[in-house]
Swiss-Prot record:
Transmembrane segments: none
PANTHER family (alphabetical): HEMOGLOBIN FAMILY MEMBER, HEMOGLOBIN SUBUNIT ZETA
A family per Pfam: Globin
Family membership noted in the UniProt record: Belongs to the globin family.
Gene Ontology molecular function, alphabetical: haptoglobin binding; heme binding; metal ion binding; organic acid binding; oxygen binding; oxygen carrier activity; peroxidase activity
Name of protein: Hemoglobin subunit alpha-D
Binding site for heme b: 58, 87
Oligomer status and interactors: Heterotetramer of two alpha-D chains and two beta chains.
Natural source organism: Chelonoidis niger (Galapagos giant tortoise)
Any single biological process term in GO: hydrogen peroxide catabolic process
InterPro entries in UniProt: Globin, Globin-like_sf, Globin/Proto, Hemoglobin_a-typ, Hemoglobin_oxygen_transport
Keywords: Heme, Iron, Metal-binding, Oxygen transport, Transport
Gene name for this UniProt entry: HBAD
Length: 141
């Protein structure tokens, strides 16, 4: 459960993320494809090379969806309902992949935020991304 302090930390850090939306999203996807190559199977039509426009575009969409979640942090289920439907019913993405991408996104945050990525920020983002992953996996039940 996110505390008010967690929410404030998430929103504060998100201001930095917004300045690098496409870069952070693309880097998180590239890290996921590198570390968890099985995730590439969901993107057979993508050019998966470093810096490809398709990865950059999708990375921006991913971070945009996370931004919606940040803005509506107290109503994640309603905010992410359509995205959950898409991934569960149309794309049929294994929900474990949400956790993998969440981990990669946290690595990107840590790599780019430096000292601003404190233990408190890490815990807040870990809880937030776990909540997002859980909501995205709701339709699989």
């Amino acid at each position: 459960m996110l505390t008010e302090d967690d929410k404030q930390l998430i929103q504060h850090v998100w201001e930095t993320v917004l300045e690098h939306q496409e870069d952070f999203g693309a880097e998180a996807l590239e890290r996921m494809f590198t570390v968890y190559p099985s995730t590439k199977t969901y993107f057979p039509h993508f050019d998966l090379h470093h810096g490809s426009e398709q990865i950059r575009h999708h990375g921006k969409k991913v971070v945009g969806a996370l931004g919606d979640a940040v803005r509506h942090i107290d109503d994640l289920s309603a905010t992410l309902s359509e995205l959950s439907n898409l991934h569960a019913y149309n794309l049929r993405v294994d929900p474990v992949n949400f956790k993998l991408l969440s981990h990669c996104f946290q690595v990107v945050l840590g790599a780019h935020l430096g000292r601003e990525y404190t233990p408190q920020v890490q815990v807040a983002y870990d809880k937030f991304l776990a909540a997002v992953s859980a909501v995205l996996a709701e339709k699989y039940r």
